[in-house]
Regions:
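Glycine-rich phosphate-binding loops of nucleotide-dependent enzymes
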Residues: 2-167
Length: 167
């Protein structure tokens, strides 16, 4: 519903916008979320409505875009464990059925549906308690839309994700 404030509510829960009123409870406990870092520490992830402006680094690789939120898991001292990063990237390329010639492909060169799959996979890699999807099939073709919904349904059935529609 355009103009209903749906995206603003989602962004407030994720700490991108200040909330004007109310409290956020997670697993029965009140949590304070003033930034995306606070949200992520509480296991909340957001796939934004506009992936190109708010979600992706279009000139960067599929690998970079897949792992940027979990990069700290691959750091050993001052080095990045590239093999572990490639392994996680491939895991989510496979899980999301992303079509890409390589992990090093610039994400801006992929179709909208494959860009969206990488973005959803990025946030799934954080193992969130709550995954907020703001219009996850916006700007993708019918085939990709169907694939994204099938993946979401599979995640719900396996118990990895709880899904709520906000409208």
């Amino acid at each position: 519903m355009v103009g209903a404030g749906r995206s603003e509510v989602m962004k407030s829960i994720f700490g991108l916008m200040p909330k004007s009123t109310g409290d956020i409870y997670l697993e029965g406990k009140k949590v304070t979320i003033n930034s995306p870092i606070d949200a992520m520490k509480n296991g909340i992830a957001l796939v934004p409505e506009n992936r190109k402006l708010e979600g992706l680094y279009l000139v960067q690789s599929v690998r970079f875009n897949s792992t940027i939120e979990v990069l700290n898991e691959f750091i050993k001292g001052i080095f990045v464990d590239n093999s572990k990063e490639r392994e996680i990237t491939q895991e989510y390329i496979d899980k999301m059925a992303t079509k890409t010639p390589s992990q090093e492909q610039a994400i801006g060169n992929l179709s909208g549906g494959n860009q969206q799959k990488v973005l959803i996979g990025r946030w799934l890699a954080t193992h969130p308690k709550i995954l907020i999807l703001d219009e996850p099939t916006r700007g993708v073709d019918v085939g990709a839309k169907s694939e994204i919904y099938a993946i979401m349904n599979k995640l719900v059935k396996t118990g990895n994700v709880n899904y709520y529609d906000i409208f």
